[in-house]
């Protein structure tokens, strides 16, 4: 799976807005979480080009979460998960979870 890495961090794409998730609503395409081309389109605010790219590269994808995509840079090798509630996604790093022991 291709990933964009800068200064030891990996670009992770997520949709923080309520309504529709991005990777959480498209489990068939796990690579959309890291796709370097999508990262570039988001960073350059090229929404029309992004829409065309996603439609051609990922046929049948649900793209409701494409508006408002964000990039979070996570240290390479870190474990994380993408949580989703009502379409709004957030990224949770394993090292930042405070576990409670019974």
Question: Which role does the model predict for each range below?
Answer:
Residues 2-102:
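Catalytic phosphate/metal-binding cores of nucleic-acid and nucleotide-processing enzymes, i.e., regions
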